[in-house]
Design a protein with these regions (language model features):
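N-terminal "arm"/small-domain region of PLP-dependent enzymes with the aminotransferase-like
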Residues: 1-43
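General beta-strand structural signal in soluble alpha/beta enzymes
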Residues: 18-20, 66-69, 113, 136-137, ...
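Active-site phosphate-binding strand-loop segment of PLP-dependent enzymes
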Residues: 120-173
Length: 175
């Protein structure tokens, strides 16, 4: 392990206090593993991409994965506009669930696939048994430092006879 890089990372992370859950902004592994990648025709890039996609397929139990480059918000728009339909329950947890609500309302207005949206506080989900097509939420709501176990959301999904869609864009390393 390169101690000068490790000290650099420690010093940078020490200078700025983060009061949200999750790993530090600057990680030793990110600094030491970074390398230039071109994409098309780049063997090293292809090797890394294949490794990542193989792991994603394994943990998600999917045969195929569509990959796109973009922000977390873009990923959520893709999810909502392409998969969510019918009667939707969004779990209210904070700013990021508000973003899901806003995007879902836009999708409902523009594409008419979403028929009804209920927005219910996370503290009330144990009471729910209403049938939905989809349950959507943010298991890690960094705006308020909240983490809801995915297993709890999975139980809700089963009670509501729904599919589960999660905004896990802020939860890397926190599950």
């Amino acid at each position: 392990m390169n101690t000068s890089v490790k000290k650099f990372v420690e010093n940078k992370n020490f200078k700025k206090k983060l009061f949200t859950p999750g790993p530090a902004s600057l990680l030793y592994e990110n600094i030491t593993s970074i390398e230039p990648c071109f994409g098309r025709g780049d063997y090293q890039y292809q090797k890394i991409e294949n490794n990542v996609l193989s792991k994603l397929k394994k943990i998600s139990n999917h045969k195929n994965i569509a990959r796109m480059q973009g922000s977390a918000s873009f990923a959520l728009e893709v999810m909502i506009n392409n998969f969510i339909y019918g009667k939707l329950l969004i779990i209210k947890t904070g700013i990021y669930s508000d973003r899901l609500l806003s995007m879902s309302i836009a999708c409902k207005t523009n594409f008419k696939k979403i028929k009804k949206i209920d927005y219910i506080d996370y503290q009330k989900i144990d009471e729910l048994t209403t049938k939905y097509d989809w349950v959507m939420g943010c298991p890690v709501e960094t705006s308020v430092g909240l983490k809801i176990p995915i297993s709890k959301l999975n139980k809700l999904k089963k009670r509501c006879k729904a599919k589960l869609a999660l905004d896990a864009t802020a939860s890397i390393g926190l599950e």
